Amino acid sequence: WSLNKAIKSGELSPLDFAKKARSFDIDAIEYVSGLYTNHTDTLKKISMQKLSKELLKRSDDYGIDNVLIMIDSQGSLASSNKKERLKAIDNHKKWIDLSAEIGCKTMRVNLNGEKDLNKWTKNSVKSLTALNKYNENINVVVENHGGLSSSGKYLSNVMSKVKLENCGTLPDFGNFCMNGSPWGNCTQMYDRYLGTEELMPYAHAVSAKSYDFDDQGNETSIDYKRMMDIVKKSGYQGYVGIEYEGNRLGEDDGIIATKKLLQKFI
């Protein structure tokens, strides 16, 4: 997602993601489904099968590990409308297939579609159970990504009820806005450090969100040392994804700055 502006503008083809990552001396990547669907017309030109072959070929060409794919705009997995929820599950299955084909062990989903906590929890457990049983070799994980899912307490409770090893979380350092806009008008913010601590026991991936940096290279709104101490204390051994979402620095510079900061604490 750090390169979403370049891809949306047409400056960078989403098929060249692996090549671009290698230019930063990065050897593992996370894909975003929307950058092949609703933000570009990639999947209007080629099929899912051709897309998977192309992504695998290009990642192999540049020595890149395909780690994860983030899925958006494929329906509401927490919806109380059964027909809508089952359709969302079905929509996500083709992306589980693509994940397996390109070697991604993990696929991130969102839990949207319901504001009532009890209904949201019940619906989320049903959908996650179905998706994780569809292919037990693929980890289907949930990111704190707005609404009820941005509560570490609520999301970790869902995980405890699913009870499948390949079901888990993707803690994002920045996405803890439960109400309002996370871009300046958030009316209910969950404590990001508590939330990360609550989600890490179930983590199959981690997103290091960043927005801006001071003269010493520190993130101006997130204490990276504190965050990485939480990550390491949990025993997590996987990749930490770079997710720069700022405006002052360009995307390339933001990626480089986030990488340098992470390297101080890993």
What role is predicted for each listed range?
Residues 28, 66, 106, 205, ...:
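Residues at the N-termini of beta-strands
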Residues 28-29, 125-229:
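Acidic/histidine-rich catalytic cores of soluble enzymes
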Residues 98-119, 136-145, 241-242:
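Active-site groove signature of glycoside hydrolases
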Residues 64, 138, 234-238:
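A short helix->loop->beta-strand "cap" motif at the edges of active sites that frequently abuts
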Residues 31-35, 68-73, 109-113, 142-146, ...:
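A cross-domain feature marking catalytic cores of carbohydrate-active enzymes
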Residues 21, 59, 88, 99, ...:
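Conserved, mostly hydrophobic/aromatic
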Residues 1-102, 118-122, 129, 152-153, ...:
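N-terminal pre-domain/capping segments
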Residues 203-216, 237-251:
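Active-site clefts of carbohydrate-active enzymes
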